[in-house]
Amino acid sequence: MIRRREFRVPSSDGKSGLHTVLWEPDGEVRQLLLISHGMTEHILRYDPFARFLAEQGIAVIGHDHLGHGGTVQNGRYGYFADKAGHVCVIRDLHRTASRIRVMYPGRPLYMLGHSMG
């Protein structure tokens, strides 16, 4: 059985909590995958795909970027930051990658990005 957990990872913007989802296999975790969704998407769009990968022994993690999905604040969809929002997105990906590396040390980590991701 696949476990899906949702939690918040502090954003590098210093104000937001990134809605983060982790799909974990029931058995041994062989590999890790970080999914970076595209513009106007959200991480739960990848739920069926992430579940399939978890069934293959791959732990999958991803978060809603600033201005997307469960991370949207004040209805500002697609908004990252006043300045250098792209830098926040990159730093946030590093934060999420660090989270799963701590949880599963020594496993190879891959990244899948779609469109803006």
Language-model features, listed with the residues they occupy:
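Conserved alpha/beta-hydrolase
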Residues: 50-76
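Active-site glycine-rich loops that stabilize anionic/oxyanionic intermediates
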Residues: 37-41
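Conserved Rossmann-like nucleotide-binding pocket used by diverse enzymes
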Residues: 35, 61, 112
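N-terminal cap/lid segment of alpha/beta-hydrolase-fold proteins
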Residues: 1-27
